[in-house]
């Protein structure tokens, strides 16, 4: 089954979609996922075993339209974004079923639960969100030394 997923703009939100995407793959065993979104989001999830193609979003609507038209047909389109722009994008995507995250529908929940419930309701499934998971094929199997990562943070909206 061919699935097109539009990822959120923010890296943190993208990581919080991973339990929903993992549940989607478990339910739909033969999922072939195409990702599109901002470069940071696509780069984060591109190594998922079910991802067959990735596309970076061009903010220019004409270029975006051309890219979307070249993607072909999908069985399912899921957008984890709730913007008006996505409503326009949905018109250009060829998919049997199209779903867009509604920011006003899911309240008083953690973002992981919101994204998971969105996928559950869209596909009429029931699955609990699991752990956040980023697939990587670039990390060595064993570390001989301690590895420390530091995130200096980011200003909201930049």
Regions found by a protein language model. Give the residues of each.
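Catalytic machinery of carbohydrate-active enzymes
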Residues: 1-158
